[in-house]
């Protein structure tokens, strides 16, 4: 499979590589039997709505939904993403994700991690491991689970088990913080 894919990719991109270096596009996207030039610095300033796709593993929660903006928290801080935002890929922390619709309503989700792919042509794809509406989470249950995981941390037998429990604790603490500020 990879041999034929690699051969097709090379055969499609070979003409680009043989041309003068200044003729190479800055970015390109491989599609079946064609190469499409992409300008990652193209100005897209007159966009009215951001097209948001929000996925959880293999399930769509939102599919190219027109929204005013989305707020995500990444490893480098919080990002407010509006139409025409610069191209960026953001690694998400366990935190709330806020979606503001064009009619002014908002929905808050909790994401356990993932990536946000912000495209400068007015779309944003947020791919998460787990994502749920913040209203569906219960603070009392989260606090009970935190106590149970802290007890399990003391009884962890090896480093692997301890690491798994520490990850659970950090996500549950993020859920509790999000629920307290909601």
Swiss-Prot record:
Transit peptide: 1-17
Membrane-topology descriptor: Peripheral membrane protein
GO cellular component term, pick one: proton-transporting ATP synthase complex
Presence of keyword Ion transport: yes
The keyword Glycoprotein is assigned to this record: no
Name of a matching Pfam family: ATP-synt_DE_N
InterPro entries cross-referenced by the UniProt entry: ATP_synth_F1_dsu/esu (IPR001469), ATP_synth_F1_dsu/esu_N (IPR020546), ATPsynth_dsu/esu_N (IPR036771)
Keywords from the UniProt entry: ATP synthesis, CF(1), Hydrogen ion transport, Ion transport, Membrane, Mitochondrion, Mitochondrion inner membrane, Transit peptide, Transport
GO molecular function terms attached to this record: proton-transporting ATP synthase activity, rotational mechanism
Compartmental location: Mitochondrion; Mitochondrion inner membrane
Subunit record text: F-type ATPases have 2 components, F(1) - the catalytic core - and F(o) - the membrane proton channel. F(1) has five subunits: alpha(3), beta(3), gamma(1), delta(1), epsilon(1), plus the additional subunit P18 (Tb427.05.1710) that is not present in F(1)F(o) ATP synthase from metazoa. Subunit P18 (Tb927.5.1710) interacts with the alpha subunit with a 1:1 stoichiometry; the interaction is direct. Subunit gamma is part of the central stalk. F(o) has three main subunits: a, b and c.
Purpose of the protein: Mitochondrial membrane ATP synthase (F(1)F(o) ATP synthase) produces ATP from ADP in the presence of a proton gradient across the membrane which is generated by electron transport complexes of the respiratory chain. F-type ATPases consist of two structural domains, F(1) - containing the extramembraneous catalytic core, and F(o) - containing the membrane proton channel, linked together by a central stalk and a peripheral stalk. During catalysis, ATP synthesis in the catalytic domain of F(1) is coupled via a rotary mechanism of the central stalk subunits to proton translocation.
Recorded family membership: Belongs to the ATPase epsilon chain family.
Protein name: ATP synthase subunit delta, mitochondrial
């Amino acid at each position: 499979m990879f041999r034929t894919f690699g051969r097709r990719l090379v055969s499609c991109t070979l003409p680009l590589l043989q041309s003068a270096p200044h003729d190479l596009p800055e970015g390109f996207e491989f599609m079946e039997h064609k190469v499409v030039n992409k300008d990652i610095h193209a100005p897209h300033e007159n966009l009215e709505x951001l097209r948001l796709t929000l996925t959880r593993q293999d399930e769509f929660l939102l599919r190219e939904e027109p929204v005013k903006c989305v707020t995500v928290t990444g490893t480098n801080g919080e990002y407010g993403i509006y139409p025409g935002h610069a191209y960026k890929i953001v690694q998400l922390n366990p935190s709330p994700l806020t979606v503001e619709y064009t009619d002014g309503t908002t929905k808050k989700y909790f994401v356990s991690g993932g990536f946000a792919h912000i495209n400068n042509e007015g779309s944003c794809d947020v791919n998460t491991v787990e994502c749920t509406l913040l209203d569906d989470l219960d603070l009392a249950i989260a606090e009970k689970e935190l106590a149970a995981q802290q007890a399990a941390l003391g009884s962890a037998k090896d480093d692997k088990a301890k690491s798994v429990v520490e990850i659970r604790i950090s996500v549950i603490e993020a859920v509790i913080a999000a629920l307290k500020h909601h």
